[in-house]
Structures are given as structure tokens and as C-alpha cells.
Amino acid sequence: MPQNKGPFYMTTAIAYTSGKPHIGNTYEIVLADSIARFRRQEGYDVFFQTGTDEHGQKIELKAEEAGITPKEFVDNVSGEIKRIWDLMNTSYDKFIRTTDADHEKQVQKIFKKMYAKGDIYKGHYEGMYCTPCESFFTESQLVDGKCPDCGRPCVPAKEEAYFFKMSKYADRLIDYINTHPDFIQPESRKNEMMNNFLLPGLQDLCVSRTSFKWGIPVDFDPKHVVYVWLDALTNYITGIGYDCDGNSSDKFNKYWPADLHLIGKDIIRFHTIYWPIFLMSLDLPLPKQVFGHPWLLQGDGKMSKSKGNVIYADELVEFFGVDAVRYFVLHEMPFENDGVITWELMVERLNSDLANTLGNLVNRTISMSNKYFNGVVENKNVTEPVDEDLKSFILQVPKNVSAKMDKLRVADAITEVFSLFKRCNKYIDETMPWALAKDETKQDRLATVLYNLVEGICIGASLLKSFMPRTTERILVQLNANERTLEEMEQFGLYPSGNRVTDKPEILFARLDLKEVLEKVEKLHPKKEEPKEEPKEEVEEEKTENVIDIEAKPEITFDDFEKLQFQVGEIIACEEVKKSRKLLCSQVKIGSQVRQIVSGIKAHYSAEEMVGKKVMVVTNLKPAKLAGILSEGMILCAEDADGNLSLMVPEKEMPAGAEIC
């Protein structure tokens, strides 16, 4: 058993009970599960909490539409969410519901304590409200009159409400973020929170509602219900036994503060601004890290039922199996940029990575062991230089995986594991067991080769457990082997010499035919026929030379020109400026620096398209604020007569920071 490294408390965001979760929602619980499982492998005493967020006006309206009570509605949806989490083989320790009696009681006590402390006061709210997002906005925050977060219409709202004094703790939070560089990850999320919200100044937050009833009542003013975010965020402490009166459980004292809150990038503001400030009000330590993961997109954008592009986890499992789906969502998601899932990509990954690289390796190794030695795997120690190369490569992989997981680079970690399987496949090509089998004098060498393969697969399968736990079990059962600890993976040769593998190897992952899969998907989700356009008459256009004349600006001297500094920049992150129809906010690497630059190119490039591009930047412009966001340079573009923009990019590969002269 690995040594006990102490407690490790991690959470996901609790899922909102407005409907069945799609694969984009499910990605988070699978990601969290892989981290929790790996921390357990390392020897941590992990407590992993997830659950459901069950109050709010949106749920009240949906229950009314369904003709049932809100409690009946959330019971059904919460049960469905838990079913999906269990289907995906996630190893959570607690599934909390915000309708749990102990949670509701503590939320009332927390609200009362904040009120008694003077952090909450009664006032009136007048503004715009987005029901789906459960969020208030001022008129200036709307985009084209609609919600800046989801794009749906907002409705005027005027009501008595309680407010939390956010500004009271703002400076303290800014100082905390500056002195705890790992608190908000990835780095680009921290820059967004600081520049877009904290530095411009915080407004007081509405923390109660009177226009609906489905919520936790404020016990000293029961016509008010507690605003959903104060209710939902406190689950992270109530779920492990926090008590506002000082009678917290041993579990709370053991595990708080949380080591990791894993959440979607769209709710990072609530977790890195509202939540820490609530904790400061309660005199509780802040969580050690909040990681805002990217979205899993379905080909043409973020999944939503209104777009009709939703893929559900249980449908994917029916086609591919649990571990194949886990592998895909973990492998395909970059560290901070959105990933893409399509049926075509799923089939491609299953066939190439799972059926070929992994499945074929295991099957070939077991089959050769049975064919040549009746399943007995014996180390005859007849070695060649290629064996040492294999061993050194394999022994390095667990170290690489640990380093990646420490940084939450899960996609990179699982890629490292599969590099081990690829190296074993290469070893087969290098040693050619089929040729050794034909030479009676090479039988001990053949046995050694097969032993090395089985040993390598055992280490790889044990490393795979955090990501594909059932596949690990299936491989080790066929090899008649025990799972290795991380400490044991520091040695090569622990597989018992003379052990016997199964004589009936099973196929881990069968190859799939893309056409057949797509035909089944079509039956599951028939496409709606789009209206056909009437054929347009062809009009012969006069060809013109592709040039454009612009009005000349006044001449400048060479000395004036030399004052400007132009450099190549690499865009490492990019987000939409939600209050603007035109602006994107990019994090641009220029040499060893990372600068924030706001550009009016949203109509021409998506944030996803921008990431990874090398662009030309004016780097010595005086910083200025655009839409309240600090911009530290200018990205250069060309514009045609129709107003279309094109980024100015280097013709050849150039390093970030290269001077443009």
C-alpha cells in the first residue's frame, strides 16, 4: 500500500437540476474522477464530493410546466444525474443535494450570521434578470438587450432584496490572489477575473429573492428565499459537516480547506470572487485551488438543447462502452482551450488508440505467450541493448504521468500512458518474436522478449487505472497479475517468472465501422430537413483587379516610425468580452512576457480560432482600457473594401518575441 500523504478534499461544481446532463456536463465528473483516483494511487486520503443544485426560479417554472411540484421535479432530475455519474464509473465519496435538510438548515444559519455581522443588508433591486442563468444584470451589461452569458432575453425585475457587501472584502481578495499564484488556474482565468471584475470594482451582490418561492427561506424574513449562488456554493462546506455555531464535524476539521474546486470556465467568477468573499465573511480559510476547465464542444459549438446538437453520455456508452468514452473526453480536452467531440472522432479514436495501439498489443502478447510457451511467461534473462532502452522508457513514464497530474494536465498524462503502449508495440517490431520462434537456439531470448512485454503492459495497465479503471481490471485479469503501486512502478521485473496468462484472451475494444455507427446515430437522432433554396440565376460578373485604394494619411519621419516597436506574439488564450459585440481579449506571449490585448475582431474570428496563432503586435503602445479591460498592445490586421479583416501573420515560423523590422 502507498504511504498516507494526508487528506485531499476535492469537489466538482454541483449540477443544476434543470434537465438530463449531456456529455459536455458529464466531462467534468469524469475529469474529477481521474484526478481523485490518481491522488488515491499516490497515497492521499481523498474525499471527493459532487451533487446537485436544486433551487431557483428556473426549476420552479419547469416543474409548473411539467405539472408536478418542484421537489418531485428535482427528485427525478437529480436521480437521473446520479445515474449518469454512476454509469461513468465515478468514485465520488458523497453526492450532496441542496434540498438535503442539513444543508438547508446550515444555509439559513450562514445567512443569519452574515446579516448579524453587517455583511448582508436589506435594500431594493431594480434591473434585468435572466431566469436560465439565475443572474441579475444592469442595462449596460446586456449585449444587444440580452443576457451576456447565455444570449437569452432578460426581463425587468424590481423587488425588495438582501444584498451582500462585496466591496468590503475586495482588496483583501485581490491581495490573496496576488500572493497565492496557484489559487486560480489556468493563468488566463486569473487575468480575466482580476482585469474584468476585481480591479474595475465590485458591486454589492443580491442574495435573496421574493418573486418566487422555490428556495431556502430566510428564517427571520420568510418572504425572501436565499439566492441560488449563496445556497449552492456553501455545499462545499455543509457537505463535510460545517456548522455555523462552531460545532463542525471531525470530517470538516480534517478536510477543509478544499484542495481543489474543479468547475467549468463559465462559472469561475462565482467560485473565485463570490465564494472566497463568503468564506472571508465566515472567517474560514479559502480553498487552495480553483481550476476552471474548458468546454467540450459538439463540432459546431457549445452543446445546448436549443441548438439541437446535444450528445448524451449514455448514448455514447451504448455505442462505445464506458472506458472508451472516458478515454475520449479525457484525451481530447486541452488544458485550457475547448475540445471537440463528434461521432466521427469517437470512432477514429476507438479504432486507432484503443483497438489498435492498446487492444492489439495485449491480444498479440497473450496470443504469442500461448502459442510459443502454452501461456507460461518466464524471464530467461537473455537480454540485448534494445531491452534496456525499453525498460528505461517504461520506468520514466510513471514519473512523467505524476508530473502532468500535479499540474492537472490530464490529457497530457493519458497521452504519456499510451506512449508506453506504443513503445511496447515498437519493441515487438524490433525483436520480431515470430522470427525468434523459428530458431530453436533463440527460445530463451523469445521467452525474455515476451516477459518484457507482459511486464511493460502490467505497468501501463496499472497507470491506466485512474483514467480507464475497468480496462485496467480486464487487462490484469488476463495477465494473471496484480495492480502495481506507483512505488512498485519504479522497478522493472516484478511480474512472477513462470506465471501463466489466460488461454482465452478477450478483445478489449472491437473496431467499429464509421458508416454503420452514423446510420445508427441517424436513427437515434433523425436530421431535420432544411428548406431548399431556389436556384439563383447565374449572373456574369465583370472581373476586376483585386486592389484597394485608401485615403493617404500625413507623412511621418523615419524617426517617428522608429518609435514604434513591432514583435511576433503567440496567442495562448482568448476569451470573448461578454459586454461587447466586437471585442476579444487575448493573452499574448511576447518573449518571456504574457500581455493582455483587447481587439475588435470578434465578428471575424472566434476565441477558439485565435488560440495558437502567431500574430504581429505593436508592443510599445501606452496601455488603455477598452470596455473596462486593460489592453497592453495592438494586434495588426488588414481590412478589405467590404470590411473583412485578416490577421497579419508571419510567412515563416518565427518565435514569439521576434522583432518585426
Annotate each PLM feature.
Residues 2-77, 96-111, 116, 133, ...:
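N-terminal catalytic cores of NTP/NDP-binding nucleotidyl/phosphoryl-transfer enzymes
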Residues 78-93:
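A glycine-rich helix N-cap at a beta->alpha junction
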Residues 117-170, 174:
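Cys/His-rich short segments
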Residues 289-292, 476-478, 585:
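Beta-strand segments within the central parallel beta-sheet cores of soluble alpha/beta enzyme folds
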Residues 536-661:
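Phosphate-backbone binding interfaces of nucleic-acid-interacting proteins
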